[in-house]
C-alpha cells in the first residue's frame, strides 16, 4: 500500500511588504560591510502606507545614507508609481538606528582574535534529493513561480502585474517521494483594468506552464489565481511589512524545523544567520557525499561562547551510519565556530541583498558559498578510514 500525502510550501515576491523590509535591511548591511568588515549590524525595517522606518543597532565608523539606500531598493523592486500603493520618490524614510550595546559587543569581539556567538540560539539546515539543488520540491517550485511573476512583470510580458504577490504549491508524495503537483495558489497584485479571466489564463500559460517542470504537471491540477477575485491594493498600502517575518519562505518551506531567528539585516557574527548557512552547508554536503539521502542538522550556540554547545544530525533513516558517527564527522570536517564559519564561507562580503528574496538556500549563485558541495569528498574519506 502506498503511503500518500500532500505537503505545501509558499513563497512571496520581492514586492511583498515583508520582503521589501528584508531587502532594505540587507541593502543597509551590504553598504556597511563593503566599507567596514568589522562592523556589527542589526538592521530592522518597517514599511507601511507611504513610509519606511529603519531601526536597529550598529557598531561602525561608516555613515550609511539610509534614505538613498531604501529608495534605491524600492525603485529596483518596482514601486515607481503612487498608483501601485507606494512610490520610492514620495515615501517618507525615517532613520531610528542606534548604537550596539557594549554589553553585547564585549562577548563577540575577543582579544585572542576569536569571535564569540552574537547571541544564544538554535539553527537548522536541511538537504534532500528531491531537486538538483538538494532542496525540498514544494519550496523550490513556489520560488520559481514568484520569481517568474517578477520577471514577467519587469520584462512587460504581463504588463498588468504589479509588485506584490505570493505563491503556494501542494505536492503529492508517494512513499516519501514527490510524484505530482496537486494544487497551485497564486495571488498577484494587478492593474484595475485587467479582467480576472484574462489574468488567470495569462498567469497559468505564461508562468506555470513555462516555468514548472513538466514531469510534475498534469491536467487535474487545481488552480487558484487571485481567489478573492481582485488584488489591486497591495504592497505596503495593503499590509505593513517587517524584517524577519518570512523565515519559512527564506528557508525550507516548513520541511524541517526552524530555530526562530531571522536572517536579513544581520552581519555574520549573528549566528542566527551565519550558523543557519553553515547548517545548510553541512546538510547539503552530507547528502552530496552519498552518506545519506536526507539530512537535518541542528547547531546551537551561547552568547559570547566560541564553540557550538551542540551539534545534531538526523538522516531520517536514510543512512547506514549512526547520528553519533555523523556528528563526529561533521565536527572533524567543518569549522563551526563563528569565526570558522565566517572564514570558510567568506561571509564578510556585500552579498546579502542577493539572499533577501526567493530563498537563502537552493540557489547556486557564485556568492552563495554555503551551497557548494566541496566538502563531499572529505566526508567520504572520513568514513573510509
Curated annotation (Swiss-Prot):
The Gene Ontology biological process terms listed for this entry are: one-carbon metabolic process; S-adenosylmethionine biosynthetic process
Question: In which domain of life is the source organism classified?
Answer: Bacteria
Which UniProt key words apply to this protein? ATP-binding, Cytoplasm, Magnesium, Metal-binding, Nucleotide-binding, One-carbon metabolism, Potassium, Transferase
Cofactor binding summary note:
Binds 2 divalent ions per subunit. Binds 1 potassium ion per subunit.
Q: Quick one: which residues bind L-methionine?
A: 57, 100, 239, 270
Catalytic activity entry: L-methionine + ATP + H2O = S-adenosyl-L-methionine + phosphate + diphosphate
Residues engaged in binding K(+)? 44
Gene Ontology MF terms: ATP binding; magnesium ion binding; methionine adenosyltransferase activity
The metabolic or biological pathway listed in the UniProt record of this protein is: Amino-acid biosynthesis; S-adenosyl-L-methionine biosynthesis; S-adenosyl-L-methionine from L-methionine: step 1/1
Q: Where in the cell is it found?
A: Cytoplasm
Q: What role does it play? A: Catalyzes the formation of S-adenosylmethionine (AdoMet) from methionine and ATP. The overall synthetic reaction is composed of two sequential steps, AdoMet formation and the subsequent tripolyphosphate hydrolysis which occurs prior to release of AdoMet from the enzyme.
Q: How does it assemble?
A: Homotetramer; dimer of dimers.
**Name the record gives this protein:** S-adenosylmethionine synthase
